[in-house]
């Protein structure tokens, strides 16, 4: 993990204490860092806790700017702080898009990401009040099941967030679950219908870019333990599809249910902002692989093919990173934009 500072730090920075354990302590502004070396002045220590395992102790670091072209990676102390950051960046993206053209186009994955947006329900700031009626929400993939099925990404998002906010139902762009009576054969019909619906929207709602591809303001993406995104799975033929279709059918998903629809990779990459969240120990190994080891073009790890993505981690989610440049955002400490990973002689 490489980190570098954005501000001048004093020779001694007060520790932010969580319980009795010192989380963050800086003694000097020069030195070396290696997350794997025993001789390092900075170490990532795993400690047993009923609520959280990892703490980070930092001493003696050397400033290093983010390399050109490196992904934006930010580490937060807890999952709750990652959730807060996700909600804030979503609200920020919405305000920017609405100011620019009057609408906000958001693409969502399923899983835990939608829970991170629940803080938006509490936004009562009148000055920056969320204009829900100007939001248009889409799903980057969907299972071909009824919308009230527990497996439905739309259903999960609606129950978790959208039923409690004043967003018009017609602005929630779900698949038409009336197109099929059984799962078999549903993906082709559903993908065609969803593709047609999205292409019929005005460019004020969903702008178009190169090749007529849609430009979503923000995609909130998850990734699986195999590195899949949306319903684009490793080494599947759909990963490299590059034609006029925005929405693709998949009838042989390696994860049940087999019938799904998904954004194509070109549609994902055309979005203005693409954001991944890697929270928890279960995400750490694959996040490292995506950012540091994976082939970016062969389709073996689809998440590695997403260009110019932003990454948000908690400390456990980032614990396997070794060469990735990261920025630390911790309450009670200066903002850090990375440290050099040179080992001591």
Where are these regions (language model features)?
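N-terminal chloroplast transit peptides
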Residues: 1-41
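Class I SAM-dependent methyltransferase SAM-binding "motif I" and its flanking Rossmann-like core
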Residues: 219-266
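Glycine-rich N-terminal segment of FAD-binding domains in flavoprotein oxidoreductases
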Residues: 98-127
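N-terminal glycine-/serine-/threonine-rich phosphate-binding loop
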Residues: 57-106, 188
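ATP/nucleoside-binding phosphotransfer catalytic cores, i.e., glycine-rich phosphate-binding loops
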Residues: 266, 270-345
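Ligand-binding beta-strand-loop-alpha-helix segment within the catalytic cores
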Residues: 60-70, 129-217, 331-340, 344
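Glycine-rich beta-strand-to-loop/alpha-helix junction loops that act as flexible
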Residues: 108-113, 221-225, 279
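N-terminal organelle-targeting presequences
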Residues: 28-65, 72, 345
């Amino acid at each position: 993990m490489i980190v570098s500072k954005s501000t001048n730090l004093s020779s001694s920075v007060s520790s932010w204490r969580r319980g009795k354990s010192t989380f963050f302590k800086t003694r000097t502004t020069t030195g070396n860092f290696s997350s794997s070396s025993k001789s390092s002045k900075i170490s990532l220590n795993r400690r047993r806790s009923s609520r959280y395992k990892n703490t980070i102790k930092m001493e003696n670091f050397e400033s290093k700017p983010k390399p050109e072209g490196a992904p934006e990676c930010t580490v937060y102390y807890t999952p709750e702080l990652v959730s807060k950051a996700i909600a804030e960046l979503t609200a920020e993206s919405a305000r920017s898009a609405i100011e620019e053209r009057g609408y906000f186009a958001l693409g969502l994955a399923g899983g835990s990401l939608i829970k991170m947006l629940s803080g938006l329900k509490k936004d009562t700031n009148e000055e920056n009040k969320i204009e829900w009626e100007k939001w248009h929400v889409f799903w980057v993939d969907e299972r071909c099941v009824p919308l009230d099925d527990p497996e439905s990404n739309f259903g999960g998002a609606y129950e978790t967030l959208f039923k409690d906010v004043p967003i018009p139902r017609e602005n929630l762009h779900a698949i038409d679950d009336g197109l099929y009576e059984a799962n078999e054969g549903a993906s082709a019909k559903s993908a065609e219908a969803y593709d047609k619906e999205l292409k019929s929207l005005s460019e004020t709602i969903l702008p178009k870019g190169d090749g007529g591809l849609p430009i979503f303001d923000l995609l909130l993406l998850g990734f699986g333990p195999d590195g899949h995104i949306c319903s684009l799975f490793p080494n599947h033929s759909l990963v490299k599809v590059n034609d006029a279709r925005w929405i693709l059918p998949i009838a042989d998903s390696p994860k049940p249910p087999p019938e799904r629809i998904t954004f194509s990779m070109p549609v994902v990459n055309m979005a203005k902002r693409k954001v991944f969240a890697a929270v928890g120990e279960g995400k750490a190994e694959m996040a490292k692989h995506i950012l540091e080891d994976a082939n970016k073009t062969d389709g073996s790890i689809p998440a590695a093919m997403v260009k110019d993505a932003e990454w948000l981690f908690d400390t456990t989610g980032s614990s396997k990173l070794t060469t990735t440049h990261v920025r630390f955002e911790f309450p009670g400490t200066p903002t850090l934009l990375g440290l050099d990973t040179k080992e001591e002689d």
